[in-house]
Amino acid sequence: MDIDASPQVHANQADDVFLIVGDKSKLQTFEERLQLNYDKGERYFEDKAVPDATIDDIDMDFVKEYTDEIDYGKSPLEYLKENRGFIKEKDGEIQISTAAILLFGKNPQNFFPRARIRFIRYEGTEEKFGTEMNVIKDVIFEGTLLNMINEAIAYLDTQVKEKTYLGSDGTFVTDAEYPKFVRQELIVNAVTHRAYSITGTDIQIKMFDDHIVVESPGKLPGLVRADNIRFTHFSRNPKIAEFLKNYKFVKEFGEGVNRMCNELEQVGLKDLVYHTNAFMLQAVIYNSNVGKTIVEKTAYSLIKLAVAVNKSLIDYQKPAIGEEKSAIDDKKSAVDKYVFIE
């Protein structure tokens, strides 16, 4: 018997909460129950007060930049106090929320050391360990969420291969191995929707020869599942999501995954794949080399080169005596039939 997931956390008369795992029910600890509340949106970790944080830990100059961006007329401090509960007063003390530190903090990693992005480049198509470790780049991005996103996107752009070829119209065309929007959206989604309550690990971008994996702490939130993620939206961190929306990383909530899938389809790449591995969500995209052997890749490159050379020669070929221009056009048409999508 299949039981649909509930959008709420339910407790029995003894106030115990159980999670169905396979055909068994597992009693949840206090921490596991709290994480369920965060995942289902009954509570938001971004609203949690940060111990020992004070107003001096907030970069008011950056808050001013943001309020200018959204045309907010009052002071930065008034914005933090009067909007979204970034700062609250309780029992005569000022409480600084997690969202305030992550978005506007002078040094968010002082309070959340693993709230960062780590880029790892591997040689080959799989992750190896020990004496076979194949890491060739390892770069960490820190700061506010906006700073991390901008730096990670810019760095990933430098790692993506580009190919230039002669198009059917006779002009040179340059394509990246992964669409730019897809690369950007994977990073934005990871930062926006990660479970910041899971403090022991960071967001990781793992780049291989034939695919990229973006790992983000936390499972799919709410009722979002791998089979409905393309058209279902749920925000684990609504304040963070709204902040990033105001910086126009995406036009509207919920359109990003669908657009990523569409762009991958348009360039002939495999579908975006999501996996849940323990407490980590993995998003995987593949480039055109996936599944090809070394021999196939070499042969493919040689054929492409031959076609490009032949096309160039035909373009500059003059009709021989007695040869009609239509014969040259027929040759061009034959070469144009070789359309390559890596």
Model regions and ranges:
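ATP phosphate-binding glycine-rich loop and adjacent ATP-lid/helix-beta elements
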Residues: 181, 227-269
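Glycine-rich/acidic phosphate-handling loop/turn and adjacent ATP-lid/helix
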Residues: 212-246, 290-298
